[in-house]
Swiss-Prot record:
The lineage of its organism: Bacteria, Pseudomonadati, Pseudomonadota, Alphaproteobacteria, Hyphomicrobiales. Belongs to the class-II aminoacyl-tRNA synthetase family. Type 1 subfamily. It holds the Pfam family tRNA-synt_2. Keywords: Aminoacyl-tRNA synthetase, ATP-binding, Cytoplasm, Ligase, Nucleotide-binding, Protein biosynthesis. It catalyses: tRNA(Asx) + L-aspartate + ATP = L-aspartyl-tRNA(Asx) + AMP + diphosphate. One of its GO terms (biological process) is aspartyl-tRNA aminoacylation. This is Aspartate--tRNA(Asp/Asn) ligase. L-aspartate binds at residues 175, 221, 454, 495. The gene is aspS.
């Protein structure tokens, strides 16, 4: 028999009754029932119940074992009594009557419980992550992560993509987020950077003639902590394709992403055909470029109904600025004053002056609008709004006014808030859609200049003609995001592979041809030697997994994450290094400036 086990702790069934077996694992818990000891033995695969009675030669050792000790058990498989069968366990019809128990490794008193799922301080969980990972839910999440990534690889390979690994040590780029820098010992005073994404390398692969590329790519960004991103590193399904339009990228990747969700959604419905929503429409309809489409609320402009009306707050704004708009946020079943007042109070807590509303109710046989706005704009305008928004008795509508560029995010938050409070959101399905036609440029208010809105390597729609003849803020990009349930889960574009168009695009943000050559020399140089039209995308693996397993945050699907202060409490990183190491790297530390 094998030194440690003949079976795993999930393998034994009723057909094994009478067999002599050997198991090894962790003591999940010990129970004493009338002098007989019951030990739940756990390994990676599952749990098996061990029985040690006082007449067994194993009993003396069984009395000493405690939670999370590692033991080996020899014994005979016996069927449980009918009233003792545990239907929650695959091994629940059998138990092992121990004949020998060997302690392989005792455990100290635990700093956090492994049995059960009690809440525990996060820093303790991260410091003792090796114990935390033994807990059932987290262990299951990590295995789901492994299976999802394997499925991504399988699906990409099946449709003709080749996996290539791109360098981890690369050049620093001033674009985007802050780099993690690595000093060079061989080249004093110079630094490598960890890649924020394999963007330039994957485009170079297309120039090199590798038609379809993908990898499970680690990405590193020295960003301030965010709720939706772990400090330090994250992973993406990165891909690129040659000789494609953006429609072909969508048609290629939609079955892959839908298939991943269907495979791991545990029966929850997944969108069959992904909608394609223009960025401008997403902002105006949902107040977000990553809308949760499970929420049925769709906003509309109702400016005309307030122009010249008796509701002077809005009417005066419209009269004084032609760019002012009024947006309506319909709220089916929200037609009570109590709910409307709660929404108004919430708006004030968000720093807004309030949230105007109308709600409709039956007065005899007549449907009437109620609330201060209805009173001020009159019955005819109130009825026109109701008909436009498709509202009935018991429904409400909220209103925001001003410059859409200033208020759209708040309007989107109000839409989300109303949908959640009224239980309009179906949480048991996955709604995916493409957001397309992103703006190529945006106005940087802080620096009073035009800047790239998203990926500077995207091809502008209209190419050189658009760059030379259009208002930069009107130019759209061949850029697209894939969104799911209110999260951006992938982003991509058709790339700008023409050197002269690339230079012109960067000129608009104040960078010269020399700047482009210095900052993106490898890519710019490659484009001089025959670059195919190409495009691709990258899907955020961590976020996809979080959605599929229903985790509340990214730490629940990551093996050894840092905390929100970017500290690795398990390994003690970041840490000081020795003076000798610094000398080797030609690095001298300056005194820390106190803020």
């Amino acid at each position: 028999m094998h030194r440690y086990r003949s079976h795993t702790c999930a393998a034994l069934r009723k057909t094994d009754v009478g067999s002599n077996v050997r198991l090894s694992g962790w003591v999940h818990r010990v129970r004493d029932h009338g002098g007989i000891l019951f030990i739940d033995l756990r390994d990676h695969y599952g749990i098996t119940q061990i029985v040690a009675d006082p007449d067994s030669p194993a009993f003396k050792v069984a009395e000493t074992v405690r939670g999370e000790w590692v033991i080996r058990v020899d014994g005979e498989v016996k069927a449980r009594a009918d009233d003792a069968v545990n239907t929650n366990l695959p091994t629940g019809e059998v138990e092992i009557f121990a004949t020998e128990i060997e302690v392989l490794s005792p455990a100290k008193e635990l700093p956090l419980p492994v049995f059960g799922e009690p809440d525990y301080p996060e820093d303790i969980r991260l410091k003792y992550r090796f114990l935390d990972l033994r807990r059932e839910t987290l262990h299951k999440n990590i295995m789901s992560r492994t299976k999802i990534i394997a499925a991504m690889r399988r699906r990409m390979t099946e449709i003709g993509f080749n996996e290539f690994s791109t360098p981890i040590l690369t050049a620093s780029s001033p674009e985007g987020a802050r780099d993690f820098l690595v000093p060079s010992r061989i080249h004093p005073g110079k630094f490598y950077a960890l890649p924020q994404a394999p963007q330039q390398y994957k485009q170079l692969l297309m120039v090199a003639g590798f038609d379809r590329y993908f990898q499970i790519a680690p990405c590193f960004r020295d960003e301030d902590p965010r709720a939706d991103r772990l400090p330090g590193e994250f992973y993406q399904l990165d891909l690129e394709m040659s000789f494609v339009t953006q429609e072909e990228v969508w048609e290629t990747m939609e079955p892959v992403m839908r298939g991943i969700f269907e495979e791991f959604a545990e029966g929850k419905p997944v969108t069959k055909v992904f909608r394609r929503i223009a960025y401008d429409d997403a902002i105006r309809t949902y107040g977000s470029d990553k809308p949760d489409l499970r929420n049925p609320i769709e906003m509309q402009a109702v400016t005309d109904h307030f122009a010249g009306s008796g509701f002077k707050v809005f009417a005066n704004m419209i009269a004084n600025d032609a760019k002012v708009e009024v947006w309506a946020i319909p709220a089916k079943t929200g037609g009570s004053r109590a709910f409307c007042d709660r929404m108004n109070s919430w708006a004030q807590s968000e720093g807004q002056p309030g949230l105007g509303y109308i709600f409709w109710r039956k007065e005899g046989d007549k449907l009437e609008g109620a609330g201060p706005i209805a009173k001020n704009i009159g019955e005819e305008r109130t009825e026109a709004i109701r008909k436009q928004m498709g509202l009935e008795d018991g429904d409400a509508c909220f209103f925001v006014a001003g410059l859409p560029s200033k208020f759209y995010k708040f309007a989107g938050d109000a839409r989300t808030r109303a949908g959640e409070e009224l239980n309009l959101v179906d949480r048991d399905r996955f709604e995916l859609a493409w957001i397309i036609d992103f703006p190529f440029y945006e106005w940087d208010e802080d620096n009073k200049k035009i800047d790239f809105a998203h990926n500077p390597f995207s091809m502008p729609q209209g190419g050189m003609d658009a760059l030379e003849n259009m208002d930069p803020l009107e130019i759209k990009a061949y850029q697209y995001d894939l969104v799911c349930n209110g999260f951006e889960i992938a982003s991509g574009s058709i790339r700008n592979q023409l050197p002269e168009v690339m230079v012109k695009a960067f000129e608009k943000v104040g960078l010269s041809q020399q700047d482009v050559e210095e900052r993106f020399g490898g890519l710019y140089r490659a484009f001089q030697y025959g670059a195919p039209p190409h495009g691709g995308m990258a899907a955020g693996i961590d976020r996809v997994i979080m959605l599929l397993v229903g985790a509340k945050n990214l730490r629940e699907i990551s093996l050894f994450p840092m905390n929100q202060q970017a500290l690795d409490l398990l390994m003690g990183a970041p840490s000081e290094v020795s003076p000798a190491q610094l000398r080797d790297l030609h690095v001298r530390l300056a005194p820390v400036q106190k803020s």
